[in-house]
Amino acid sequence: LAALPAFIRKARSNGGCGDGHGNVCGFGLMHGETLVGYATSDEAYALIVDIGTTTVAALLVDTARRHVVAARGEHNAQSPYGADVISRIRHETEWEEHRNGPNPLQQAIAKQISAMLAGLLEQAGIGDVDFLSLTGNTTMMHLLCGLPGEHIGKAPFIPATLEPMRLPAADLGIASQAPAFLLPGISAYIGADIVASLLAADAHRSQPPFLLVDLGTNAET
């Protein structure tokens, strides 16, 4: 609510952003029921990233027109630290014990996302995105945030958090001035990537029974 006056003032002062009846148009970014950002142009871009254990996929999306502007997929830069989540948790745990310099796994994925974003922006001729939406399995999300993953790898498999997060992308080491939204997870081994799949499939509108299968490096059904 507090953001609405500035949004309306900016929209009306831009001219041409309205329907002639006092209504304004634009793009609003919601966090729950809170308006946390807005754009009054007819273009609003987002970087959508799925951090897979093996592959990182990124889409540059024109959210106003609802189409993909550019896409890129790369081998996960954390792969030298292990091909599976348990190996990477082991490396991260060893780093936690000694704390010799920056967290290498966190740095690897942050630098990779930054490079992918820069390449997509250059390809599309855009300066920056309006926001980033980041998803992945629970271990990948922990490694992105620099959170300890030790307890994901052993019973009773307790993550540091499964909550959604909103924070500046720069706080994650990603080269962007935009906010980053991290989708919530469900459990230690049912992550935000599954939540994204359920949302994309409109599972909440589907009649039971409903089957979702994710055949990634780590498969879930």
Language-model features: locations:
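Nucleotide/phosphate-binding catalytic cleft detector across ATP-hydrolyzing
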Residues: 1-48, 53, 102-132, 137-211
